[in-house]
Amino acid sequence: MTPRLRLQPESVGIGMTSQRVRDRLVERLRESGIQDEATLNAVRTVPRHLFIDEALASRAYEDTALPIGHGQTISQPWVVARMTEAVLQVAPKKVLEVGTGSGYQGAILAALGLEVYTVERIGDLLRQARKRFRHLGMNVRSKHDDGRIGWPEHGPYDAIVVTAAAPALVDALVDQLAVGGRLVAPVGGASSQSLVQLTRGADGEIAQEVLAPVTFVPLLSGMLD
């Protein structure tokens, strides 16, 4: 069951950010193949309009990616839901998110009661995301660092969600995945990417599965303030 968020009036929304509009988004996601009810309830509950610029708030509950500045985007809700649904299948408790961005994916995971660690290379985006987490009463642990390194001090993780695409799965992140854990990440270049899930079995063996074609911004090294 999704924990109740401490929502302020502006979080609940009216008009194009109202509960009715959110319910319509959830039904579209359900029709597009998202089946996990906890995931759908988190999408219904977390106020996506607070994670984007106010000028775009009327589009917050469209099933589309939107710009958040610094050449980055808030992911399409279907993609967020599909990645969340995939990691929930292994019943995780502790999750690493690589690429905080607006904070929306991390908020979805936190709303599901998971222990969330998130890393972002762009300082300005991370500062904004932290404000949103505080506003919603979410205890998300965050770090300004190169996401390709992960956050090994708190590993291993039951699940890892990567929100930017690399040409191949990053070994440093795979190494932080616990036995029985699952990593979900976009893999590929600018012209072709796939959402891939990697599961580490009890014997340590790695199994991979392609979930869907996707389009993400690239996973870059280094840090920006």
From Swiss-Prot:
Group of enzyme by EC: transferase
Active site (catalytic residues): 75
Keywords: Cytoplasm, Methyltransferase, S-adenosyl-L-methionine, Transferase
SS bonds (residue pairs): none
Entries under SUPFAM superfamilies matching the protein: S-adenosyl-L-methionine-dependent methyltransferases
Location of the protein in the cell: Cytoplasm
Listed GO CC annotations: cytoplasm
CDD domains linked to this entry: AdoMet_MTases (cd02440)
EC number(s) per entry: 2.1.1.77
Catalysed reactions listed for this entry: [protein]-L-isoaspartate + S-adenosyl-L-methionine = [protein]-L-isoaspartate alpha-methyl ester + S-adenosyl-L-homocysteine
Family designation: Belongs to the methyltransferase superfamily. L-isoaspartyl/D-aspartyl protein methyltransferase family.
Its biological purpose: Catalyzes the methyl esterification of L-isoaspartyl residues in peptides and proteins that result from spontaneous decomposition of normal L-aspartyl and L-asparaginyl residues. It plays a role in the repair and/or degradation of damaged proteins.
Protein name: Protein-L-isoaspartate O-methyltransferase
Species: Xanthomonas campestris pv. campestris (strain ATCC 33913 / DSM 3586 / NCPPB 528 / LMG 568 / P 25)
Gene name per UniProt: pcm
